[in-house]
Amino acid sequence: MTLDGGPNACLFVTNRRFESDDGPLEERFGNAREEILKFGYFDTKIQPSLGLGMLIDATAWFQNEEIQLIEVRELEQAAFVRQARTFIQGSPYRSLLVVVHGFKEAFPSALRKTSFLSHVLDVNTPVLLFDWPGNQGSMLSGYRRARRVAEASGAELARTLLLIIRGNKSRRQVFT
């Protein structure tokens, strides 16, 4: 569901801190957490040959060739809520799939893998990625840092869910 009706668009919320003001938006996010939420929209082009087995070996080729980021755009909170409402109300079951990415994921990778998951599941519902900065390194100390960041990010995830719920005053809300 895209702003213009295409099938590969998703919304995102992240509590990653900007590392840079230069370059594409998806490349500016680092691995530091902050309480300020950033909202946005992204769209991808997925190669028709892409299959489920390719996620197992998510090489750089897979990341960059099979799933291409077409557009990554930041939205103000109010615009994000309006877009989420439009997506949800336009879906057959007035639903939203929330994908939480973090551990050992850089932001561009989380965008691509979320799009891939949406594509493979083919559930005909809009998708929201909540991404926290879990790429803290692969050693034990990195795992421990990632765990602390994940625990602290729970408050931002809760705020995100409340924002979606309050922005969509539908009669039915199911959490599983």
Task: Tell me the role of every PLM-derived stretch.
Residues 144-168:
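Alpha/beta-hydrolase active-site loop
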